[in-house]
Amino acid sequence: MSGVLTASGPSWIAPFTGLSPRQFSKLITASRREGADPVRKGRPWSLPLEDRVLLVAAYWQTNLTLRQLAPLFGVSKSAADRVIDHLGPALALQTRRRFRKNAVLIVDGTLVPIRAHTVAAQSKNYRYSTNHQVVIDADSCLAVAVGRPLPGNRNGCEAWELSGAKDAVGHTTVIADGGYRGTGLVIPHRRERGRAELPAWKEEHNTSHRKVRARAEHAFARMKTWKILRDCHFKGDGAHHAMLGIARLHNLTLAG
């Protein structure tokens, strides 16, 4: 059974990973160092690590079913499933533990439509979704933390606390939108009751705040080009692993 897609053909790398061949090579080297390609007991993998990483990225990028995707790599559906189960978690973004002095982070939530109703709930878009809290660095726009998914009907305040995103950033300054009221994060000023408009200095603060916060929205827009985040059919931790892996690939793309 011969496949069509392989990482040995550089032309396949960018469409499915968003990375240049050089960036992809860095990812493979880092993955090996992190233990993503251990010596297995029993039957060895039928694909080299490079092709397995490409398979996982292609799955996230295209959202093809495994029956559709597996033949493109010359493997069975069950083999492709094992590759994704093994490598999905191994490609995850590692939460940053320390931040530079005076760092400013941005948090926002995004809803990922998901078919596994055991981990989802109907949200404002009337679809079953999970709420993912993503934290990015305001200067570099790199993702630094991704919270565990919660049912999509949880608001930003709850999700910030319960997803683990709050614990991941410690006491670092974090800005957010008005949905995070009462969390201690830096949010926009609101009009006081009985006042028609905000003082000029508060309006200026809000304008600046909005421009910085837009960087998170742009990061989400780039991440949502991965089709798995528009209609996810993973069960269990699959959606979380996909979000973490896509965040890592997003960072590699930006870092150059």
Spell out what each predicted region is.
Residues 28, 56-57, 161:
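A cross-family signal for key residues in well-ordered alpha-helices
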Residues 1-42:
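Charged, often Cys/His-bearing segments associated with DNA-binding zinc-finger transcription factors
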Residues 68, 72-256:
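Short, well-ordered secondary-structure "scaffold" segments embedded in the functional core
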